[in-house]
């Protein structure tokens, strides 16, 4: 903002995520340099304004002694964006289960959130990456673990709980995009005080007195870690000679 620049996109990836993507793709973001956190900045507008903003931005980067790459073609831009797009696919190769949290914190608290993730990764010996929308403080924290490993699963749950408490301490919210649904119900009371909670329950009861609209969501505690993994198949994923899969019931 001090530069008078309003990027259309501002995406962040921490060092661990960058290392993960580079290992997955076999490509270096900054050739010849060790992995660093990455901030993807995209400008839009008319050609004149983009050129002016680009000059100001590059000067700020140089004055700050930061390494940067400038995309001078669509092909180069796609190469840089691949780092962001490959974040989730790269992490899926590390373990069979992912807890993907879309927490959001005030802009000036993002560094504290990232530092918290680094501490959790070390303390709990887990594969945890953080990336996301730096422009609005909505960062995705991905906990990778193997579901059948009870010790690792327990560590993932404890680390996630610590993350949610930290988000609350920083004045943030447990969901910036995906909503509460089922998986976040164990943490939702961290975000709302008793008065807010009772108000929401009263509104729910007024609009849905018989509890038929999206039953079990938000207000009923649901423990996702006690649930068995559910595998679904689609009709076009098996031949007509194969027996139809048994319906999934709950």
Give the ranges of each region predicted by the language model:
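Noncatalytic alpha-helical scaffold of FAD-dependent oxidoreductases
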Residues: 1-250
